[in-house]
């Protein structure tokens, strides 16, 4: 299944957010030659159980990686990724973003579809492997 930007379910949107965060951090780590799991990867289980609180943590942790990209030849990539994050956030309906409750498996669909889309648009459809 390809990315469907018209899907506005809470779980799908949260998965998409996680994918964009993963993409930003992975791009910055790869550019620096660092081989380690991203915060999005490390916090995926917690994210599935407590998405709103965990998203806050993940987004705040993106700042140093965004700064790395901003001062590099990949600043355009960062601009597009931030624009995508903003567009996804704008799709949440009412109180869905802060609604309590775990995410269903649908968040994984949103995550993988968004990640595939990001890597195919960047021309690098083979993300680096983690250790």
Task: Give a label for each model feature.
Residues 1-131:
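Intrinsic-disorder/low-complexity detector
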């Amino acid at each position: 299944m390809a990315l469907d930007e018209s899907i506005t379910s809470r779980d799908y949107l949260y998965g998409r957010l996680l994918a964009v965060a993963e993409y930003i951090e992975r791009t910055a780590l790869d550019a620096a030659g660092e081989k380690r799991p991203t915060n999005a990867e490390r916090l995926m289980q917690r994210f599935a159980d407590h998405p709103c609180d965990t998203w806050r943590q993940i987004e705040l942790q993106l700042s140093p990686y965004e700064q790395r990209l901003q001062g590099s030849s990949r600043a355009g990539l960062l601009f597009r990724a931030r624009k995508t994050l903003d567009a996804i956030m704008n799709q949440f309906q009412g109180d869905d973003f802060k609604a309590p409750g775990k995410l269903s498996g649908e968040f994984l669909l949103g995550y993988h579809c968004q990640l595939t889309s990001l890597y195919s648009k960047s021309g690098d459809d083979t993300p680096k492997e983690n250790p």
